[in-house]
Amino acid sequence: MIEFWKSEYTRILSICHDSGTQYRNKNVRMRSLYLEKVWVAFKSFAYWKEVIWKTKQEFRAQYSFPKTSLEANKVDDANTHSPKFVMEVIDVFVENLNDLMKINDPSSWLFVPGHMKEQIEKVLKELKLLRFFVCFVSNKCIQPQYQHTTFYTHALIEASHNAMVVWLHLPVYGIGNQDLAPSEVSRLLSDFMEMKIKSIQPGISRNSIYIDVLQALKSTIPQAQQKHVAESGIVEIPTHSLTVGLSDQMANLQEMLCLLRDNLIHLPILDLEFHLQDMDSVIVDAGLLIYSLYDIKGEKEDTILEDIKRELGFDLPRNIEPIKVMVYLVMQKAFQCNLPRIHGLGYVDFLLKNLKDFQGRYSDSLAFLKNQLQVIQTKFESMQPFLKVVVEEPHNKLKTLNEDCATQIIRKAYEVEYVVDACINKEVPQWCIERWLLDIIEEITCIKEKIQEKNTVEDTMKSVIASSQLARTPRMNEEIVGFEDVIETLRKKLLNGTKGQDVISMHGMPGLGKTTLANRLYSDRSVVSQFDICAQCCVSQVYSYKDLLLALLRDAIGEGSVRTELHANELADMLRKTLLPRRYLILVDDVWENSVWDDLSGCFPDVNNRSRIILTTRHHEVAKYASVHSDPLHLRMFDEVESWKLLEKKVFGEESCSPLLRDIGQRIAKMCGQLPLSIVLVAGILSEMEKEVECWEQVANNLGTHIHNDSRAVVDQSYHVLPCHLKSCFLYFGAFLEDRVIDIPRLIRLWISESFIKSCEGRSLEDIAEGYLENLIGRNLVMVTQRDDSDGKVKACRLHDVLLDFCKERAAEENFLLWINRDQITKPSSCVYSHNQHAHLAFTDMKNLVEWSASCSCVGSVLFKNYDPYFAGRPLSSHAFSISRILLNFKFLKVLDLEHQVVIDSIPTELFYLRYISAHIEQNSIPSSISNLWNLETLILNRTSAATGKTLLLPSTVWDMVKLRHLHIPKFSPENKKALLENSARLDDLETLFNPYFTRVEDAELMLRKTPNLRKLICEVQCLEYPHQYHVLNFPIRLEMLKLHQSNIFKPISFCISAPNLKYLELSGFYLDSQYLSETADHLKHLEVLKLYYVEFGDHREWKVSNGMFPQLKILKLKCVSLLKWIVADDAFPNLEQLVLRRCRHLMEIPSCFMDILSLQYIEVENCNESVVKSAMNIQETQVEDNQNTNFKLVLIEIHLFCLFDMKGIESISTDMKEKKLTVTRDVDADEVQLVVEKLRNVAYADEVQLVVEKLRKRGML
């Protein structure tokens, strides 16, 4: 056969060589020819016209496919038969055909009409698959490549045929009708397609060539370790062949091969390495089966499948079974390998709810799985108590085993969701789904058995091996720099203070120097000399109770007196008796759990002799738990002066830093993030380098990488000991931008939507999530930036940069979170998709979202983060991307957080897994199809500036979305109030409802009846009438926060508020009087915060507050109210802590009874009458001097506003007369700078003018 091909096709190879040369040697590119718009004006046009014409004449003269015989041209180049040459030729041909297809201008001489484009697209696919085949044979072959010359030759001829068609397609002007007619070109392309099943020569066909080469490979399949991308490509070849002739009869085989192909691309090579040989066998067997069938059918046109199977002796079910096994294995592995390794324990809750919904909504599609799904549901429900234990007992002695089992359970939950969805959408065959669910049931059963076995194991883990302890930095003789004020405070507590025993506890994040500071005090002679016994022990995360006791006894009575053979209880008694009559100083370092203190505290007797215990811990809760008299000390981070002082001391010792290095040194110290440990690490690097500016500059440039790598072990240790239910919450901080304050309510809503929060009967998910957050704060992993004034709850937080970087890096390692930055180098088309399954993707550019969307079908979250501060608060339009259509690729999307920054063209109502949406919209209505999002829990839609002020119509179908927990839309109104009243369900889960717009009290009552469990409500009302008697509007009993804004300012409120558990009330724009406030107060016995803004106080502008009104009120704020006379009874506001008065210009004075409110801590007066200021100062004098209220604070502010409306870029300029500071609220145009300065100089306060000039100078405007 080889000789036949050599003799018969040598002439064709000669033409192939010519066509390849035209493409490759002369660098002819179809696209480049098209883009050369000025051909006619240059000599190049004549040259190329001649080249094209001569080549076409040569092709047609020598080979007319195959009308004319070929002349014998002797071409026997060994390189022509090499796979490398063949692949290079195919690459060139594919590139040119692609260029040809991109030309869409009908006036171009290269334009390809539509019917011919379809044929060329088919040919392109054939060429790509042919290249895969050549690559596969070349990679898998262990014999010399010349053994497959026939195959490579045939591949080259097929590719070259297309090259000739491309050249023949090119027209030549001025030659009349001598060009190849379009119909002939079309036939030539059809000839090529027919070569797939037609015999080229009696006894020789394309299929027979493929059979020969596959049989050769089958006999010697090696242990090949090739990239699996090639594997997925080679699967496409036999799969694609099934589209001709027998596809209807071989549908099952075709389906399996398609599944194999589609899933291989998602499977990392490491997960295939133990199956590559089996994979090769399956691919070769599939090819042999298909090509053998087609080889016989090509010779016998009327042959049916049964005849072919009989002739070949095939048992089709038996031949297909290995393929089926491999398909299932690859599908399962492709899904499992990309699951995140960190999970939220609330995912099982979400799955169980969805399984019930699925079986109701898709009963027909899931009918054949009914029994299996019920078994799975029962097994998951039986696991719920175990998952509860994992959350509630994070320090269980079998913590590792528990968390491993919990992780396996969550992974099975992911699989069930995926398989059920695939069944509903018919994306996976029934045989595969049934096998997969049976395996899941078996695996869940094994997990349950492991848990049950664990529960029967005797607990013998009182002592834990300490081999995994984090290597500690040297503590003794370590000179401390900084914290001088802290040291002095602690020294006084150790030597003075209460007569009884006291615990001096320090807590703070890793690396702050707690241990160093404690050892400094412990070794201070002035301290130690005052105690009879000094002893210390280091606890760490893993410890032995007995070893701690032995360490303390060795210090207390000496090494020789310690009896190590005693039991722990006996040693504890010995220690207690040793300390009992003495004044002792004990250092207990690095305590991780309250239970440690429970174990040790009984050994430390209190006999009122000023004994002291120093305790260090990372966790606030531990420090607070151990405290007796002194409050726990939260060790602060270094300031810039201390940071530089420590760095200088560590690098230069007793010497001083060179003036040349001081600036760069201070910059490096600042870059260390004020963390002493980080500063010490960098100092070690600098100490080993030449003291040259260039060297230090290099350190500064690389500081981020080095400091984080070196300090990672400390942070990693804190992360390692986190309970598994907190790990996902902590890593999720990696989705936020650096140095940005994080809003807590938003963070908690995201945590819940991501299934990080495990439900607990009797508690809301929000309350549980707040507990998770406080735990992370107590471990010093999260920094609080703002707490609520009334209840002390955290309102905002942030992460230190070191911790944030750790979260991002670790989250990527765990396949949990991937950042796709606008300068991302790795594109989805050029990488292995290791993050496309159930991960969270954070984007910084909308274009990245478009590029990645096609490869992210199983992503669970899409988070958009805008780095550019210029766009802060400015929504970005996504119309150019049609984002709603792009998002359809994310079929498992549960969280879509566009951070109020992206305008979406429409809500993606097809994504029924969605639980959280936050975005901007331009429309004034929402489609009724939004109810398709039946899993949605949080809907936050902001309006663009064009839509601001307009009422948005909310369809009545929203009230069918019974899982909604948070609905935030500015100024919305129900579209059909009658339908809302008659047909809609109650939203029992809805907790926050922001900005509905009511025009009647009846409308408000109706909506409140539909939302019985609201906790927070912000709404706008339009009160049209002033009734003779107030109507009592009953708000939900659980309501805690209410903000009411009146759209028609200073209209009377037409209802009385009744909310027995309301803690926060804000009224704005109303006309009120004492009667209304008195009646309201009777219904608000638990109110803690009252804010009245822009309120008109009746005709007399008077407010009488009697005894018993607002008994729990802590904060009272009045702003721009018309209040003139304020009469307050002596015993009113008994628990008031803060009083804020802003622009209350008519108020005569603050009532004198505020002098006697012992709980009062703060009064703020801004832009009020001088008499009000005077009364506030009198209250301060009485509170501080007479009541000894040392915590009382008075703040007086006077602000003058200069509105420079004629100046571009200026909104307002405010001068604070008390603090002498000036603020420009917007940037100023450079052209207007001088005008701004001149106008400011007219202000009487020259120092304020100087301040703004300095600001402008820093901005580069002066």
Curated annotation (Swiss-Prot):
LRR repeat extents: 890-914, 933-961, 1036-1059, 1064-1083, 1084-1112, 1133-1157
Domain HMA: 1181-1248
An annotated GO BP: plant-type hypersensitive response
Binding positions for ATP per the UniProt entry: 508-515
Keywords, alphabetical: ATP-binding, Coiled coil, Cytoplasm, Hypersensitive response, Leucine-rich repeat, Membrane, Nucleotide-binding, Plant defense, Repeat
Matching InterPro entries: Apaf_helical (IPR042197), Disease_R_plants (IPR044974), HMA_dom (IPR006121), LRR_dom_sf (IPR032675), NB-ARC (IPR002182), P-loop_NTPase (IPR027417), R1A-like_N (IPR021929), RX-like_CC (IPR038005)
Presence of keyword Nucleotide-binding: yes
Recorded topology in the membrane: Peripheral membrane protein
Coiled coil: 364-384, 475-496
Cellular localization per UniProt: Cytoplasm; Membrane
Similarity remark: Belongs to the disease resistance NB-LRR family.
Biological role: Confers resistance to late blight (Phytophthora infestans) races carrying the avirulence gene Avr1. Resistance proteins guard the plant against pathogens that contain an appropriate avirulence protein via an indirect interaction with this avirulence protein. That triggers a defense system including the hypersensitive response, which restricts the pathogen growth.
UniProt-recorded name of the protein: Putative late blight resistance protein homolog R1B-23
Organism: Solanum demissum
